UniProtKB/Swiss-Prot annotation:
Disulfide cysteine pairs (residue numbers): none
Highest taxon in the source lineage: Eukaryota
Lineage: Eukaryota, Metazoa, Chordata, Craniata, Vertebrata
Gene Ontology cellular-component terms listed: sarcoplasmic reticulum; sarcoplasmic reticulum lumen; Z disc
PANTHER family in the cross-refs: CALSEQUESTRIN (PTHR10033), CALSEQUESTRIN-2 (PTHR10033:SF15)
Posttranslational modification: Phosphorylation in the C-terminus, probably by CK2, moderately increases calcium buffering capacity.
Name of the coding gene: CASQ2
Organism: Canis lupus familiaris
Renumbered residue ranges of the record's region Calcium regulated hydrophobic site: 221-242
Name this protein carries in UniProt: Calsequestrin-2
Family: Belongs to the calsequestrin family.
Length: 410
């Protein structure tokens, strides 16, 4: 009887827990919201939505692993479509083989990519194919390209954004032709780069902005760069941002991780791992910031900072690939072609390198004194020796064969 009472009490508690509302994570409800895009329905679908999210994929083969991988991607898209159902966003898939003509028309050339059509723009998503990352990316994309700052509290919030590129301009009003040019320029980089503006003289004074002036903030830098030759056209602003788009120190973010990784310097990245929430990681990041600030004018220097907390699924892979321990800060040089790497020796967490020691190590990397090819050369030498041995063996075999032939002739 006692067990029966406990069982009933357990069921009651379980029912009570399920009745709680407010923290229900979405699960796929089974409804199909993602459709296949074809030449026939393209115009109809395009008219229906302000924003269209397209997954361009290779034809699904009979291979079971490939089918599973495709189904996982499809479920992610279905869940994102479900979560954003109240927004004016459409979700479609384009088969590379069946719809080759349509793909060519849309300019799609990379199978497995996700593209977003918004107005006359095509934005390629270069981030982690995960539901939460995609939802945040799309929500940022449908917002206004420029965020307006009206108060000192909003200035404080603006100043706290330190780990990404941001721009802010001071204009007379939203009707100003120079603000409109700024807004048009912002659309080129949305949602990856944040554009802010103010029409408030008090805010402009606090930020040391002059009328029609735009300041460019590089990540982790104390002072902005005032874009020269104001007022600017849309084209001038776009050109300036593109020229300064590779910061001295940049954070690897889930929403644009592949774009950042592909933006290497001569085939290598200087990579730093540091957990911001960890005291040693925080200290190491502060040292990295100091090095970046002291070397911000060096066009050959760009450090990619990775917080392992942002990529829990990749930690084991990185530790195995780079042969490092990510429970402590690390900095190394990585070859993006084959993932060969060389890492600075950091004895322990209590003996982190100083900014000067870090600069000396980085100088050795940039000069080529420290590089990822040394091990390859050693392995290559071993390989050459083996090849020579093989050649010798091969020659001996030929000689033996010739001897055998002579014997047969006799």
């Amino acid at each position: 009887m006692k067990r029966t009472h406990l069982f009933i009490a357990g069921l009651y508690l379980l029912a009570s827990c399920r009745a709680e509302e407010g923290l229900n994570f979405p699960t796929y409800d089974g409804k199909d919201r993602v459709v296949s895009l074809t030449e026939k329905n393209f115009k109809q679908v395009l008219k229906k939505y302000d924003v269209l999210c397209l997954y361009y994929h290779e034809s699904v083969s009979s291979d079971k692993v490939a089918q599973k991988q495709f189904q996982l991607k499809e479920i992610v898209l279905e869940l994102v479509a479900q979560v954003l159902e109240h927004k004016d966003i459409g979700f479609v898939m384009v088969d590379a083989k069946k719809e080759a003509k349509l793909a060519k028309k849309l300019g799609f050339d990379e199978e497995g990519s996700l593209y977003v059509l918004k107005g006359d723009r095509t934005i390629e998503f270069d981030g982690e194919f995960a539901a939460d990352v995609l939802v945040e990316f799309l929500l940022d994309l449908i917002e206004d390209p420029v965020e307006i700052i009206n108060s000192k509290l909003e200035v404080q919030a603006f100043e706290r954004i330190e780990d990404q590129i941001k721009l802010i301009g001071f204009f007379k009003s939203e009707e100003s032709e120079y603000y409109k040019a700024f807004e048009e320029a912002a659309e080129h980089f949305q949602p990856y780069i944040k554009f802010f503006a103010t029409f408030d003289k008090g805010v402009a004074k606090k930020l040391s902005l002059k009328m029609n002036e735009v300041d460019f903030y590089e990540p982790f830098m104390d002072e902005p760069i005032a874009i020269p030759d104001k007022p600017y056209t849309e084209e001038e602003l776009v050109e300036f941002v593109k020229e300064h788009q590779r910061p001295t120190l940049r954070r690897l973010r889930p929403e644009d991780m592949f774009e950042t990784w592909e933006d290497d310097l001569n085939g290598i990245h200087i990579v730093a791992f540091a957990e911001r929430s960890d005291p040693d990681g925080y200290e190491f990041l502060e040292i990295l910031k100091q090095v970046a600030r002291d070397n911000t004018d060096n066009p050959d220097l760009s450090i990619v900072w990775i917080d392992p907390d942002d990529f829990p699924l990749l930690v084991a892979y990185w530790e195995k690939t780079f042969k490092i321990d990510l429970f402590k800060p690390q900095i190394g040089v990585v070859n993006v072609t084959d993932a060969d790497s060389v890492w600075m020796e950091i004895p322990d967490d209590d003996d982190l390198p100083t900014a000067e020691e870090l600069e000396d190590w980085i100088e050795d990397v940039l000069s080529g004194k420290i590089n990822t090819e040394d091990d390859d050369n050693e392995e290559g030498d071993d390989g050459d020796d083996d090849e020579d041995d093989d050649d010798d063996d091969g020659n001996n075999s030929d000689e033996e064969s010739n001897d055998d032939s002579d014997d047969d002739d006799e």
